[in-house]
Amino acid sequence: MDSRLNRIQSKMKLWIKDKNLSNPSIPLKVLNKSFRSSRQSSVSNGHGLYSLDRDETESLMSSHEASNAGISLDSSFRVIQVGQPEPQYGNNAVTNTKYDLFTFLPKCLYEQFRYFYNMYFLLVSLSQLIPPLKIGYLSTYIAPLIFVLLITLTKEAVDDLKRRRRDSYANNEIYTVNDSPCAAQNIQAGDVVYIAKDQRIPADMILLETTVGNEAFIRTDQLDGETDWKLRIPCSNQHTEGIVHADAPIKSVHHFYGTFTLNNQKRPISVDHTLWANTVLASDGVYGVVVYTGKDTRQSMNSSKAKTKVGLLEKEINFYSKILCTFVLVLSIGLTFSHGIKTDWYISVFRYLILFSSIIPINLRVNLDLAKIVHSKNTESDPNLPGVVVRSSNIPEELGRIEYVLTDKTGTLTQNEMEMKKLHVGTMGFSAESMDVVQACIQNYSTPIPLSEDSKTLVRNLVLALSLCHNVTPSKGHDGVVSYQAASPDEVAIVKWTSTLGLVLTNRTRDAITLNNNVYKILNIFPFKSETKRMGIIVQSPDEKITFYLKGADSIMQNFVKPSFWLEEECGNLAREGLRTLVVAKKDLSAEEYSAFSLAHSDASLSFSNSRDKKMEEIVSRYLENDMDLLGLTGVEDKLQKDVKITLELLRNAGIHVWMLTGDKVETARCIAISSRLVSRGQYIHTINQLSSREEAHNHLLTLRNKPDSCLIIDGESMEFCIGYLQNEFIDIVSDLSSVVICRCTPTQKANMTRLIQEKKQASVCCIGDGGNDVGMIQVANVGIGIVGKEGQQASLAADYSVKEFSHVSRLLLWHGRISYKQTSKLAMFVIHRGLLISVCQVVYSVISAFEPIALFQGLLLVGYSTMYTMLPVFSIVYDRDVSEKLVFLFPELYKEMREQKCFSYKNFISCVLISVYQGLIIQLFTFYLIGFEEEGKMLAVCFSCLIFNELIMVALQINTWEQTIVMSELLTLMMYILSVPFLTNYFELKFLLGLKFYWVSALILFISLLPVWCGKALKRKLKPSSYAKLQR
């Protein structure tokens, strides 16, 4: 064995030299490790599984090549015995929950005490256990903190229970495993699973056997975003025995390396034999053996771990809380030392810190959490958003701060339903309304529009070519209804269309196609490849004529057909309509011509060199792909979701950059970008595809810099190239474009691009998708929106918001997002204002009290001020509306204006602080001046009453629309205060409250306190009104 290993290492060295690899030691280590692993596997399993031959050496080479290309690949093979469960690889349970029974409390408490103001109040509360620092009652400080934590813990528990229920639904889906029913979560590696048609594949499997035919199709749009169905080949013709050697789990959905051994005969298996988890079987039932489960599946490895999202507003409030705390600390030290240095000065500092703790209000957390709940419930109860589900109530205000929307294409912007829309033959064009003319040509009866025989022949030839040049297989269901299976929905749409014209595909085998009762022999078939952008077939008709048919992208096909004056122009017309265009051509072959081609092609296919595919393509090009007869063009429409065009226009007008990230081909994405109006009419489209050098990338970016209004279409590999070499320049230029389309984009690339925008642009990003391949970016985004898809609910379950269709996004952002951000910001400002106001009064009282840290308000007054006396009016702000729904959608620019001005900005914060300081000084100083310092009962009655009424009037001055809830909260609070006064005899002098002096003093103080605020507001509306204020007029 060692001699064979040395021989293979020698070959590896030659291969390394050929590949110009920079680190030749890696593949030898990989080979040694894999050889040892395989040898141990052979001994432990009692099978002579590994005699390292050429195929295995190439497999190991490919493994390193994949690793060198950036695929994280461990070459330790896992051995799977068909039908023998392997519990050591773990179960197949899906989990999106954040907590379990043991981690809930510590994790939640950690999340809460990450907020500075919560930690601050915890320390303040604990300080009351130290006798020298005790001020008033312990419950005055500890009760609000406990209340805040209980509200938050309850909300988190409810949200996580909902996630657990959703996971339970997916985990308990029943499958037939080893001929017995089994829940999806209990499936293990080694199990043989039967998958029925249209059933979701629960784990990564190797296809063993098909029940009908010898091939299967899967839909992968929920995994990689590609709309084309994928052909899969069984590696056996039975499902009861065999051994699979598979490489370690990797992220790449396009690579797989392994072998399948049956009766001591070993054969290589590749990605063509795989059934990845979360894809859907599109053909008849199959049997597969499970290789990877749970977190080891491609789907899970391409998904980001769920994290607790924190809104930007929360971070801003946390920052300003630290500023206020610093101010409190400086103020406390200043007041302590302003009256001389005492031996116990530190106790005075701490007592001042506790007295002024209201500056950082503990109930800010409660108010914000309750506001989030209210906004979330309003969203869910919106009759214009049927089926919307708020899965995370932590970030409703983030909906109002979105700068970038990154959206998937398949199932999000489109319905993934293809429809034949246009046909172009020579100078004749046929739309959907005039297809009866085409049908008349096919069925040889008189056409509604007179056509010459030559024209009719051209139409027949084109339709016949479309009926034959495809990979579609008909399948009859149990109900007798015929369905079509293919690797491309375009082909299915075209075949369905030709069947309506009378050319019905009734049967297909590997060797023949049957149209009605006519059998056409398949001599050769050349499958579609993204690199070649075309698909061809050679058939022999019932009358022995041999014809080569070819269809593909216009950019490629124009090189193969005879010169045409109309081809380029008509292709451009169809593309501008957003249709997926195919050029169709044919070439008649004599028996001698076909024989010569067949011999040359066969010789090329037997080549063992790495250039075998290239040689075969050269033969096809030399013998077939030249001087072909142009038959015509087809235009297929990928139907858009409802109101997609309107929604995208609204988002753009709101100043939001819209990007489309898709796993689909460049041509397909380009068509959808045009048809959805993501690209405006006449807008310049710049395409970057298959970049190979830094100079080329730099030139592309230079072009884009000079054309900021253009749309960029770029493939995933080119994007990775730009990020790797020119990251800052790439992000700076691309982020300013009006629209960007990224094609051939993997789930990991989607998530990475989201992170880049967040980090480099410090912008809020909203990601929208409907498939499992979108989960990663949805979890990374500031706000993730999942659309309930036809193929599953993975994106919907992982998202913060779940909606039924893409058109709901505009309402979610422009209406609910704007309200949430604006009103929550205003609420936070008022809570801070309320805390500062009472703290300023306390500062004035301490100064007048010879700088002693004595409490002005204690007990019920201190607790009641921020709860039953002011909480309802202040909280009612969340129900205010500055403009109507109609105006928001008529003027989406309001969204952009609000986001750019920032509701919770330095300017607004400083304004809030100055107003609070001014009003606090006026209330406390004028109370002392007009009432006196000695009569504490009278002084407290006036001062506290002015604080309450000042807050009620301040709220009233800020209200734009007097909703019933707001009016009731003001009146109810006023009544509660009046009715509670008789119970405040320990603090107030009740006889004074009944006298005239109390009323005129209070009225005078309130007038002086509120007059500047009212005047400032009136002047601003007059001289520099905001856009919404103008609309209110």
Swiss-Prot record:
Membrane topology summary: Multi-pass membrane protein
Cellular localization per UniProt: Endosome membrane; Golgi apparatus membrane
Positions of Mg(2+) binding: D408, T410, D770, D774
Major enzyme class: translocase
Site (Involved in the release of the transported lipid into the cytosolic leaflet): I362
Annotated GO biological process: endocytosis; phospholipid translocation; retrograde vesicle-mediated transport, Golgi to endoplasmic reticulum
Annotated keywords: ATP-binding, Endosome, Golgi apparatus, Lipid transport, Magnesium, Membrane, Metal-binding, Nucleotide-binding, Phosphoprotein, Translocase, Transmembrane, Transmembrane helix, Transport
EC number: 7.6.2.1
SUPFAM superfamilies xrefs: Calcium ATPase, transduction domain A, Calcium ATPase, transmembrane domain M, HAD-like, Metal cation-transporting ATPase, ATP-binding domain N
Active site: D408 (4-aspartylphosphate intermediate)
Residues annotated to bind ATP: 408-410, 491, 528, 530, 533, 551, 580-581, 662-664, 744, 750, 773-774
Chief location: membrane
Transmembrane helix is among the record's keywords: yes
A GO term for molecular function: phosphatidylethanolamine flippase activity
Listed transmembrane segments: 133-153, 274-294, 317-337, 344-364, 768-788, 843-863, 913-933, 939-959, 965-985, 992-1012
Record field: catalytic activity: ATP + H2O + phospholipidSide 1 = ADP + phosphate + phospholipidSide 2; a 1,2-diacyl-sn-glycero-3-phospho-L-serine(out) + ATP + H2O = a 1,2-diacyl-sn-glycero-3-phospho-L-serine(in) + ADP + phosphate + H(+); a 1,2-diacyl-sn-glycero-3-phosphoethanolamine(out) + ATP + H2O = a 1,2-diacyl-sn-glycero-3-phosphoethanolamine(in) + ADP + phosphate + H(+)
GO cellular component: endosome; endosome membrane; Golgi apparatus; Golgi membrane; plasma membrane; trans-Golgi network
One Pfam family in the UniProt entry: E1-E2_ATPase
Cofactors, names only: Mg(2+)
CDD domains named in the record: P-type_ATPase_APLT_Neo1-like
Quaternary state and interactors: Functions without a CDC50/LEM3 family accessory subunit.
Protein's UniProt name: Phospholipid-transporting ATPase neo1
Protein species of origin: Schizosaccharomyces pombe (strain 972 / ATCC 24843)
Gene from which this protein is expressed: neo1
